[in-house]
């Protein structure tokens, strides 16, 4: 079990880290309480937990293999969320990645190597997730603070 102090800053970032306690635990499919690593992840957990159209959800349940063009390596990444949503008379599975909007667009400053690398790695991950989700008949969405706040 990971020892996490809610509201504390993450080891590798300035993000708040904490344990999310679902209000509707029957909807959460994890074996342990989910640990959010950012405010956006916490907001997404709250949205999935409280939305009546969401039947079930899980946090970081699926490893996806992708080719990291920035570092020329095959890597794995865990999709942030998988949700099953009611859509009329049927259900659909949605893979969700949560990112700050600034990381979903090419950097404005072409000389910002860190931002350019982050964007390139993210697009590699998202292309792999999109392809795999589509092959399984699922949807893939990237949510930012604009959709979650």
Task: Outline where the language-model segments fall.
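Electrostatic, structured charged patches in enzyme active sites and in nucleic-acid/phosphate-binding
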Residues: 1-149
């Amino acid at each position: 079990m990971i020892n996490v102090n809610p509201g504390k800053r993450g080891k590798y970032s300035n993000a708040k880290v904490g344990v999310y306690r679902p209000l509707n635990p029957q909807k959460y499919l994890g074996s342990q309480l989910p640990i959010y690593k950012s405010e956006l992840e916490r907001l997404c957990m709250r949205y999935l937990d409280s939305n009546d159209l969401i039947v079930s959800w899980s946090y970081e349940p699926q490893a996806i293999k992708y080719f990291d063009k920035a570092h020329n390596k095959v890597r794995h990444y865990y999709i942030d969320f998988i949700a099953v949503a009611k859509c009329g008379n049927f259900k659909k599975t949605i893979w969700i990645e949560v990112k700050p909007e600034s990381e979903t667009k090419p950097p404005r400053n072409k000389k910002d190597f860190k931002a350019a690398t982050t964007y390139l790695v993210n697009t590699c991950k998202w292309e792999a997730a999109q392809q795999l989700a589509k092959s399984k008949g699922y949807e893939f969405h990237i949510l930012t603070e604009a959709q979650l706040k």
